[in-house]
Amino acid sequence: MGGQVIEVEVAGVRFLLRKDLRYTESDEWARLEDGVATVGITDFAQKELKDIVGVELPEKGRKVKKGEAVATVESIKATADIYAPLSGEIVDVNEKLLDQPELINDDPYGEGWIFKIKVEDPGEFESLLTPEQYVESVRKRKE
């Protein structure tokens, strides 16, 4: 896994974060490159959901607003909405997940990415949580 990784434990759950990503209160991560954000769910989220058995992907070309539910991940435990961390247009989806949803469990920050957004306002990225802020967000919810 590229990028610096930190391991954290909150309420008995050990999970990894990457220092080069930004995060949301609803457990998504985003990586911004050349105006396009790659989005997935955090290691913490996949551990909470347990075995992921299905994914509903957004349509390419769909315009989305920050905070809008755009995808769904189904696990043996629950179904979770995945929210757009930034406003823009869906330009790519990870179709591998349709046959291999477990990639989200196996590699949430790599092969398990869910969709990509061409971002309307790259400045919006700075409003997302740093790894440290995300850990605090998880602590507030879990402890």
UniProtKB/Swiss-Prot annotation:
Choose any GO biological process term that the UniProt entry carries and state it. glycine decarboxylation via glycine cleavage system
The highest taxon in the source lineage is Archaea
Q: Where in this chain does the record put each Lipoyl-binding domain?
A: 36-118
Q: Which UniProt keywords apply?
A: Lipoyl
Q: Name what cofactor the protein needs.
A: (R)-lipoate
**Which SUPFAM superfamilies does the record associate with it?**
Single hybrid motif
- Is Translocase among this UniProt entry's keywords? no
Instruction: Identify the Pfam families for this entry.
Output: GCV_H
Signal sequence, renumbered to the chain: none
Q: Which residues carry this modification: N6-lipoyllysine?
A: K77
Q: Which GO terms describe its cellular component?
A: cytoplasm; glycine cleavage complex
Textual note on the cofactor: Binds 1 lipoyl cofactor covalently.
Among InterPro entries, the record links this protein to: 2-oxoA_DH_lipoyl-BS, Biotin_lipoyl, GCV_H, GCV_H/Fam206, GCV_H_sub, Single_hybrid_motif
Q: What PANTHER family does this protein's entry cite?
A: GLYCINE CLEAVAGE SYSTEM H PROTEIN (PTHR11715), GLYCINE CLEAVAGE SYSTEM H PROTEIN-RELATED (PTHR11715:SF3)
Q: Subunit details for this protein?
A: The glycine cleavage system is composed of four proteins: P, T, L and H.
Q: State the protein's purpose.
A: The glycine cleavage system catalyzes the degradation of glycine. The H protein shuttles the methylamine group of glycine from the P protein to the T protein.
Entries under HAMAP family matching the protein: GcvH
What family name appears in the similarity comment? Answer: Belongs to the GcvH family.
Q: What's the protein here called? A: Probable glycine cleavage system H protein
Annotated organism of origin: Aeropyrum pernix (strain ATCC 700893 / DSM 11879 / JCM 9820 / NBRC 100138 / K1)
| Gene that specifies this protein | gcvH
